[in-house]
């Protein structure tokens, strides 16, 4: 009888010790910080698959496909890159901006994009660029396949302050353009495959 009691006691004690050990191990993995300084943070799955990178400009990787960088390139931004279940880049949030040796503002803006599976091109893009060479603020939707990337929808405004919605055909040619100029004049233009306006609607003057 005593032997059975000792066996049961030993089993219970072993179970409790194991539970406390596992709980202590799990608790040790959770740490709290008020502030962290880092050049780059990699987020990985338990099997090591890369899922997200938060990085400064110097450490931002090139395009990574299935865990391999092809090839390393210098991207003039800092930001956050997203990777799918296979460790292939499929979007990101990047930002930058500085003055070059001539005092011109270059690479200034922010871009949130998502890539189509199996293609290193963006099919959804929310961009804001404002530097010495370019100014664009808008939402861009594109078709992507083996033949390239073709813009289909643009909603935004340009450096002249014209707000517009552009609808393109499957070849990326603009076919419908809705615009409102800075002075408030609206218009709808219909274009042929060569980009020529074939019909246009504007405001009707009151009599």
Describe each region flagged by the PLM.
Residues 1-27:
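Single-pass membrane-anchoring alpha-helices
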């Amino acid at each position: 009888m005593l032997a059975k009691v000792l066996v049961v006691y030993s089993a219970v004690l072993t179970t409790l010790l194991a539970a406390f050990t596992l709980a202590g191990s799990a608790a040790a993995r959770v740490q709290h910080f008020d502030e962290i300084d880092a050049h780059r943070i990699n987020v990985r799955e338990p099997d090591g698959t890369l899922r997200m990178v938060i990085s400064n400009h110097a450490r931002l990787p090139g395009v990574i496909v299935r865990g391999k960088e092809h090839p390393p390139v210098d991207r003039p931004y800092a930001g956050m890159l997203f990777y799918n279940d296979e460790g292939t880049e499929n979007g990101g949030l990047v930002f930058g901006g500085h003055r070059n040796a001539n005092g011109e503002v270059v690479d200034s803006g922010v871009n949130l994009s998502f890539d189509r599976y199996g293609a290193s091109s963006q099919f959804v893009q929310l961009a804001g660029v404002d530097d010495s060479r370019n100014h664009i603020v808008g939402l861009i939707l594109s078709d992507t396949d083996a033949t390239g990337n073709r813009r289909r929808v643009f909603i935004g405004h340009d450096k002249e302050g014209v707000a517009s919605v552009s609808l393109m055909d499957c070849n990326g040619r603009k076919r419908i353009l809705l615009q409102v100029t800075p002075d408030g004049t609206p218009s709808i233009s219909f274009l042929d495959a060569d980009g020529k306006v074939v019909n246009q609607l504007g405001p009707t003057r009151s009599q």
